[in-house]
Amino acid sequence: MKNLIFIVWATMALPSAYAQRVTAPEGKTYVYKEANGVSRELEIYFPKAKQGPKKPVPGIIMFHGGGWGGGTRDQFRYLCHYFSTRGLVAATVTYKLAPKARTEEAKSTESRKRVCITDAKSAIRWYKQNADELGIDPKRIIAGGGSAGGHISLLATTTPGLNDPNDPKGYDTSVAAYLLFNPALSAGDAKDPEVDFLQQLKADFPPSIAFFGSEDNWMKKGWDPAYDKMKSLGVKSADFRIAEGMGHGFFNRQPWADVTLIAADKFLKELGFIEGEPTLAAPKTGEKLAKRP
């Protein structure tokens, strides 16, 4: 089957009413790759069947966070389930986790993150290869992820290398847009260009929306330089939203899970990927995202 287009534990204390991480029922599981006897899987959520001719719909593909060496795909079940109710096909992916960072790696020019990106590229190609069966438009795929997963989604769709030679031929990994939840970019990636988003970022970068807590150091040391480069390159649609006073992974729990999803929904509507208004209600507690100029 073909290609498809993220969330991390909060690092600051939240009120007890918001303590539980959002979740949703499991999607339908598919194997997108077999590697060394291990099945790599993704879960897909489909919209309810409608009467009449079926038109292909946009597809979302999400990659979980966890520091490249941890995390699970259930992080984006809530997001995928929601967007399936809005008429899209949405997938959340399991990928090969990176080995733990070691002192030796600091001396190497190759990042441990490479294995994650290779699997992500395989998942996107599988999504595109099976677009007809899945009911998606391979030219309207939205990629994304949270923290490490945000980084993985960005590099899997921009770096020309790190390909699995066993992937189906004739399918690239480009996408039409991004949903990015505090993507973890680092100046330390510069030693390995194939995992460094700043070196892969070009003027034709697709529309994106990124969410950060104002107290998240990953924003200051990673996304700020990328956002500045986007502006200098003339990237036309780079939406940057900030949750004041919040830290890394804030979007994993309510009310911010719904606040960010509502903003993502409106972003996709502006691009023509979705119709109507968000079906989630804004929190009565008044949490809002500020738009970065």
Label each PLM-derived region with a short phrase:
Residues S122-A203:
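Primarily recognizes the serine-hydrolase "nucleophile elbow" in alpha/beta-hydrolase
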Residues N217-D224:
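Conserved alpha/beta-hydrolase "acid-adjacent" motif
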